[in-house]
């Protein structure tokens, strides 16, 4: 491709609305252009990148035995009413009505549609298992679409759905999809981690997320560097503290802590470690108030709490509710002297001689011990977020916390949708049974933004080779003025193109500095400069996008040199 025949539209500065570095660079590089809130046009340069991601996804899905189809983007409300999701999915669903006043939605996901296809087409156990996928545009009406295509309202997604006679068959496909996803992200050249995750609103059983590692990631990931353990922080566990409680030291005392409400403030005021404080959270659930106890430096994990049956509908108690039950304000409540159910975190259950609220404004208790000064907790659960340094639950090291951008998610849905929509098959005995289902999604357009978040510098994008719009750019210096420069550049362009290498010949009539800046911004992995001075010495100049310096390569060797670089040499 010649730059003169391509559309390169770069910007010196990013528009003011861009916040994330990927959003800024995608706009500056001419990869996308904003049409409206959360709506973006993929420009020719960006579409080349997007298609490369799609192709790798498609190749690996095909290799894993999935079958591609394409479902309608617009879906009738009747299907969503069958599963009960029409009224509960929320305002993210864009609902529309046709000229006959019939309700439809622009699909945010396709569980209902694919299940409808399955119940119409699949009759016998002999037809199973089957795994269908599509790569299609979705729409979710985000409240505040931000960060460019990272969280756009309209986006490209690969969604797959599998159907099975039993759980072992589902697990086999689930593992095949897990392997396929790892291959996809490996081929794309991304640093990523698959992590155990919550099933969320889609529902079901097992669930794993795939995160591209990036400091700007919205999600916190806990992983062990000494093992394969990794989980989203909302699901991550750690080994509980070992050993028995220390013996009580001194009598419990009530001390005045005027205006010291947070554990940080109380610890500093009393000159004790924050690890020796306990914070008490009052929550309403199951028709009454419960007290949750956490170590002062730990944070509540709401996902874990909601998995406790009698706390599944919990909410934080209001100030008025707390005052009514305890007689004091939040910040000073504690478990002592109250008849409310107490749920302690595993870490708190082993503590002794701790500090907690005295249920009296401006007072705390010190040297508090379970069994002596207050009753043992009614229940002990893991209800906190893990932190760096916690022991990995597999006992093979300590946990570390990093940030990640979710780009893939796989679920075992079981029979949630097949039962609701009566998607049954006939087994060997002729009995109708609901199909077991799996669901497997990849944010195709989001991958591009995530890759840029992970791969950039002060000059622009550094695309992994598999995603770059072009593999090599040739920049001739003085192309219009020097026939020899033009001839050598054209010769190299023809040689590399003839063996299937994607080459961009920057034949624009522009200053070298502008061409260098544009190509670094766009993120093409390999650059060759052909100039008059180099030609006099029989050389070209090569520089990889990640390289700090250029290197001189003899002209007769430059084509083979580039081929070697592309082959990983």
Swiss-Prot record:
<keyword id="KW-0067">ATP-binding</keyword>
<keyword id="KW-0030">Aminoacyl-tRNA synthetase</keyword>
<dbReference type="InterPro" id="IPR033730">
    <property type="entry name" value="ProRS_core_prok"/>
</dbReference>
<keyword id="KW-0436">Ligase</keyword>
<dbReference type="Pfam" id="PF03129">
    <property type="entry name" value="HGTP_anticodon"/>
</dbReference>
<dbReference type="GO" id="GO:0006433">
    <property type="term" value="P:prolyl-tRNA aminoacylation"/>
</dbReference>
<dbReference type="Pfam" id="PF04073">
    <property type="entry name" value="tRNA_edit"/>
</dbReference>
<dbReference type="InterPro" id="IPR044140">
    <property type="entry name" value="ProRS_anticodon_short"/>
</dbReference>
<dbReference type="GO" id="GO:0004827">
    <property type="term" value="F:proline-tRNA ligase activity"/>
</dbReference>
<dbReference type="InterPro" id="IPR004500">
    <property type="entry name" value="Pro-tRNA-synth_IIa_bac-type"/>
</dbReference>
<dbReference type="InterPro" id="IPR002314">
    <property type="entry name" value="aa-tRNA-synt_IIb"/>
</dbReference>
<dbReference type="GO" id="GO:0005829">
    <property type="term" value="C:cytosol"/>
</dbReference>
<dbReference type="InterPro" id="IPR045864">
    <property type="entry name" value="aa-tRNA-synth_II/BPL/LPL"/>
</dbReference>
<dbReference type="InterPro" id="IPR050062">
    <property type="entry name" value="Pro-tRNA_synthetase"/>
</dbReference>
<dbReference type="InterPro" id="IPR004154">
    <property type="entry name" value="Anticodon-bd"/>
</dbReference>
<dbReference type="GO" id="GO:0005524">
    <property type="term" value="F:ATP binding"/>
</dbReference>
<dbReference type="Pfam" id="PF00587">
    <property type="entry name" value="tRNA-synt_2b"/>
</dbReference>
<comment type="subunit">
    <text>Homodimer.</text>
</comment>
<dbReference type="InterPro" id="IPR002316">
    <property type="entry name" value="Pro-tRNA-ligase_IIa"/>
</dbReference>
<dbReference type="InterPro" id="IPR036621">
    <property type="entry name" value="Anticodon-bd_dom_sf"/>
</dbReference>
<keyword id="KW-0963">Cytoplasm</keyword>
<dbReference type="InterPro" id="IPR006195">
    <property type="entry name" value="aa-tRNA-synth_II"/>
</dbReference>
<comment type="similarity">
    <text>Belongs to the class-II aminoacyl-tRNA synthetase family. ProS type 1 subfamily.</text>
</comment>
<dbReference type="GO" id="GO:0002161">
    <property type="term" value="F:aminoacyl-tRNA deacylase activity"/>
</dbReference>
<dbReference type="InterPro" id="IPR036754">
    <property type="entry name" value="YbaK/aa-tRNA-synt-asso_dom_sf"/>
</dbReference>
<dbReference type="InterPro" id="IPR023717">
    <property type="entry name" value="Pro-tRNA-Synthase_IIa_type1"/>
</dbReference>
<dbReference type="InterPro" id="IPR007214">
    <property type="entry name" value="YbaK/aa-tRNA-synth-assoc-dom"/>
</dbReference>
<comment type="function">
    <text>Catalyzes the attachment of proline to tRNA(Pro) in a two-step reaction: proline is first activated by ATP to form Pro-AMP and then transferred to the acceptor end of tRNA(Pro). As ProRS can inadvertently accommodate and process non-cognate amino acids such as alanine and cysteine, to avoid such errors it has two additional distinct editing activities against alanine. One activity is designated as 'pretransfer' editing and involves the tRNA(Pro)-independent hydrolysis of activated Ala-AMP.</text>
</comment>
<protein>
    <recommendedName>
        <fullName>Proline--tRNA ligase</fullName>
        <ecNumber>6.1.1.15</ecNumber>
    </recommendedName>
</protein>
<keyword id="KW-0648">Protein biosynthesis</keyword>
<keyword id="KW-0547">Nucleotide-binding</keyword>
């Amino acid at each position: 491709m010649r730059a003169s025949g391509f559309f390169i539209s770069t910007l010196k500065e990013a528009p003011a609305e861009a916040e994330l570095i990927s959003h800024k660079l995608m706009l500056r590089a001419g990869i996308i252009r904003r049409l409206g809130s959360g709506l973006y046009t993929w420009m020719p340069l960006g579409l080349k990148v997007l298609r490369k991601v799609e192709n790798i996804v498609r190749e690996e899905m095909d290799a894993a035995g999935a079958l591609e189809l394409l479902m309608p983007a617009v879906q009738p409300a009747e299907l969503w009413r069958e599963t009960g999701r029409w009224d509960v999915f929320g305002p993210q669903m864009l609902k529309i009505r046709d000229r006959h006043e019939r309700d439809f939605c622009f699909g945010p996901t396709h569980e209902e549609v694919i299940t409808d296809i399955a119940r119409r087409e699949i009759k016998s156990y002999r037809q199973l298992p089957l795994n269908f996928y599509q790569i299609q545009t979705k729409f979710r009406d985000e409240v505040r679409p931000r960060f460019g295509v990272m969280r756009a309202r309209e986006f490209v997604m690969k969604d797959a759905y599998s159907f099975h006679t039993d759980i072992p068959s589902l697990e086999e496909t689930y593992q095949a999809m897990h392997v396929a996803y790892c291959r996809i992200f490996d081929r794309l050249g991304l640093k990523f981690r698959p992590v155990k995750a919550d099933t969320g609103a889609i529902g079901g059983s097992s669930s794993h997320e795939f995160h591209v590692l990036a400091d700007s990631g919205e999600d916190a990931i806990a992983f062990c560097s000494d093992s394969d353990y990794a989980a989203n922080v909302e699901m991550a566990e750690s080994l509980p503290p070992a050993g028995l409680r220390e013996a009580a030291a001194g009598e419990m005392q009530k001390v005045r802590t005027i205006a010291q409400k947070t554990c940080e403030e109380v610890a500093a005021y009393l000159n004790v470690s924050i690890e020796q404080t306990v914070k008490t959270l009052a929550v309403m659930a199951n028709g009454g108030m419960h007290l949750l106890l956490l170590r002062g430096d730990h944070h509540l994990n709401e996902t874990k709490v909601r998995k406790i049956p009698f706390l599944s509908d919990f909410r934080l108690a209001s100030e008025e509710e707390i005052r009514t039950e305890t007689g004091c304000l939040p910040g000073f409540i504690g478990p002592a002297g109250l008849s409310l159910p107490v749920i302690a975190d595993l870490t708190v259950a082993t503590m002794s001689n701790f500090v907690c609220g005295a249920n009296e404004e401006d007072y705390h208790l010190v040297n508090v011990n379970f069994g002596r000064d207050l009753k043992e907790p009614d229940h002990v659960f893991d209800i906190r977020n893990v932190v760096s340094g916690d022991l990995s639950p597999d006992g093979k090291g300590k946990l570390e916390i990093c940030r990640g951008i979710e780009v893939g998610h796989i679920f075992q849905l079981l029979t949630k949708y097949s039962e609701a929509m009566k998607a049954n098959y006939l087994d060997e005995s002729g009995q109708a049974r609901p199909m077991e289902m799996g669901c497997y999604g990849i944010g195709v357009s989001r991958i591009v933004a995530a890759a840029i978040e992970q791969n950039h510098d002060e000059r622009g994008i550094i695309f992994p080779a598999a995603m770059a719009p072009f593999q090599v750019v040739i920049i001739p210096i003085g192309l219009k003025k020097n026939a020899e420069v033009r001839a050598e550049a054209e010769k190299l362009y023809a040689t590399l193109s003839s063996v299937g290498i994607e080459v961009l010949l920057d034949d624009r009539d522009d200053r070298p500095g502008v061409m260098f800046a544009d190509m670094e911004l766009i993120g093409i992995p390999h650059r060759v400069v052909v100039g008059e001075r180099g030609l006099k010495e029989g050389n070209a100049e090569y520089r990889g996008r990640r390289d700090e310096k250029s290197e001189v390569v003899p002209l007769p060797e430059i084509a083979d040199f580039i081929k070697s670089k592309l082959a990983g040499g």
